[in-house]
């Protein structure tokens, strides 16, 4: 996907499928509704970095950059995939229990919680591959 200059922008367990039988080692992505190109179709150039973007994707998994309002990139897909893998390994993410009703306040609180856990204890109990 990234080799084709596309970013998914909504990676989550529900959008990741495993092949069957002899193809059980193949991972398939689904739901490309938020996918976009990182290349401008008119100029052929990489899209510029932009701030103050609305959060796109599933809050539980998106990168801290998405919470900060930065344009999402391949890097954010990879960080989001890391959050998904942590969720699958641990069975939870430390920030998923936050319950704030107002979306803008919740997005901000989730971003702050993610930053704190990344800086402190997020990888506790995880194999070295997560570090």
Task: Give the label of every model feature segment.
Residues 2, 13, 58, 63, ...:
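Eukaryote-specific detector of the first structured module of a protein
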Residues 43-45, 55-70:
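Protein kinase subdomain VIII
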Residues 21, 66-123:
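Conserved C-lobe activation region of Hanks-type protein kinase-like domains
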Residues 12, 33, 65, 79:
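Anionic group-transfer/hydrolysis microenvironments
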């Amino acid at each position: 996907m990234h080799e084709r200059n596309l970013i998914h922008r909504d990676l989550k367990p529900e959008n990741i499928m495993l092949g069957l039988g002899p193809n059980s080692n193949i991972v398939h992505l689904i739901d490309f509704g938020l996918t976009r190109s990182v290349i401008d179709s008119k100029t052929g150039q990489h899209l510029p970095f932009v701030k103050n973007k609305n959060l796109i994707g599933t809050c539980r998994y998106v990168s801290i950059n998405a919470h900060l309002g930065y344009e999402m990139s391949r890097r954010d897909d990879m960080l989001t995939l890391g959050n998904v893998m942590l969720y699958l390994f641990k069975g939870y993410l430390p920030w998923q229990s936050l319950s704030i009703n107002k979306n803008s306040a919740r997005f901000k609180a989730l971003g702050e919680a993610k930053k704190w856990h990344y800086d402190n204890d997020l990888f506790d109990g995880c194999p070295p591959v997560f570090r």
